[in-house]
């Protein structure tokens, strides 16, 4: 069932061809609300306003639509949001309702193609088309040449001789493991100079360079089981990309196509140019003069579409950006999605950031409106913030627990001061302009360092009232940046506060924040904060949340956990795997860590069947692999740090969740951004069936912009993935088990 099920709305479909940036379509109303979809910097761009919100959305992953070839475009719009499809597959979505009903009076849609842009086959549909219906309406790309024999004709070979970029498609199979050979080859003057093969290493594409050296591009894997496979080699934009069965398997810098073949006079399939044949067969193949996009390649392989809905994005509830997803399915079946709401600028702290949630009562098909759960005063870079939520549920009583970082105004991880900022009871320690310290008591009163009463009282939101001689006057706000309020009297410590909030009614109402620094932070730490995403509840009942913190050298961090054996009433910090670690021949510890190569940052946790706890960690080790360690005592101590050879690391947040079934109780799925392109991108999901000891399959979910993510298993057993495109927003996708199971090779 589509995520749009149950919503009425509208759809539009068309085809366009563009050679230059310019307008495509727009919707106008008499009160100046409306929107326009156009091409900017060779990518789609949507901007405008509805009765509910304004938006400006850069669909940067649609780059190169100005290639002069025909593309299909579809838009669906409902009160739950809108989706944009390019060449049959969803390329973007937004919380904005793009339908005429959501804009002003007499809103009408117009085609507005600019110079150098053609539009045809425009249709308006009085219903929300499903992803499958849109795919069926989208034609496959037209090849320059299709193979009808083992050799191309001389005329067709000549057509290829000047192509510096383009796409190769072939459907092949071999006769079983260990049987390999050439899928396609090309040469000139009796010398083979281009070859596409299935080998022991995987799919290999190589081109003979000008200096007589082979330039080799390999997608590592085993596609020799005897099944039919589609292989696509896409060459352009400075890279060679290799797809198998519609999914990106390798993105490799460098560009080499048929124009690199000196005196090209022969192109063959199912054999090399000497006649040595593939141990199998090529059923069909085609060559394209254009660099096909991800959607077009998926269309060639009949990939089933994944339905995605935007839950938080730029403009939603008047905020400039949302980032940092958290996601959980509760015992009741309610699904809770959390996000940082960045009101005026998109940056991390220091910034005005709120914690917000949306909830689903039908397994992620529909979502309620935004709830602002936790907010602090101030605006912009001077505003106080909460950031990086991490969520867990206590299954014993249903309590939903979230740990989150709080910074006062003007403070973030880079400039936070060392210290706790609270007393042994978790009460804020305040200071005035002269450095005198005070305690903010639970009843709102303030006492000085000796416990004496003062003229100050403080409201729950931090507003200070000064009462002298029976007269009240404002005293600023303790959470604001220093110097912002002319009435400033008292401020909290300029440090990081790890805080907890909870809900006992599935996220409908929430507690206020509780400070945890007194239990888990040390005076020498300026930062001690969550690893955003998901925590775990062990079978023993212990709640465990991944964290990381810095020491004497503020730029270097160590991963750890905090844990609670009483449902969140009290917390303890476990040791870091960096404490006592032998690194490059010397013993290190988390307080004095002075090398980034040994640092461990945001982490994710999995409890295994044997009770051990696996932690997978973001890092900048030269290996370029995700760091890992195992605890046998519930996170109190950790074993040696090692690196997961199967998991690429580009210094980005990881997330993992168990996905067990009766026949595979230790199935785990892991996700991260796995490649710099040069931006952070290529979101990949990986599958383990032994609790994360080995990783047997992987599949690229989004080949371009992709940063943080959080996952949960939904009530119907499918995977819910809440993921981000850096600054654009957070998107929810439902992924069936067979999607990742099909990647097993």
Identify the function of each model-found stretch.
Residues 290, 298-745:
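Asp-box/BNR beta-propeller blade signature and adjacent active/binding-site loops
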Residues 1-298, 302-304:
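Extracellular glycan-associated modules
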